């Protein structure tokens, strides 16, 4: 079966972000979304280190060492963009002022619980950052992730076994095989990669799925 590439996943997320939305892009895979937003839409990107009005990655050779996102990657600033204190940034996150946040994940449960800061492994370095604030503070939480671990287990699970970031906070999951909405009583498959069938997807995930 064919899988969506990381950029294709980012394109799919970008397509679902509406005009006028205030959006935080988490560290890692979610940062790719900035490069695929429709230029005709006015969308305000927020970074927790204190940026609002963040643009896409700069062209090679045009990087500004003083302009980076929370993941320390070079970014650009759109006309009208602003810098501000870290405390003000977290006030925006915690105060319910963000319409959408896009986060990566180690696990997402069938009820929308999110685990994305620690695997519990003794040699792993916990890195919660602002994820808990975003997971609870944003009006909607989108997750971008590969559906399976390196050993083939589904990251979409009945119940998270890793430490939780937030409870019942994830509304939609974008993966390399499918886009899945999380509802209190069902997992609804919105879209699948070419060659992927609902029975095959259900076998990988191991949970009941419904077609949209």
Language-model segments: residues:
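N-terminal active-site beta-alpha-beta segment that forms phosphate/nucleotide-binding
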Residues: 1-78
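Conserved phosphate- and dinucleotide-binding cores of soluble alpha/beta proteins
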Residues: 4-8, 59-212
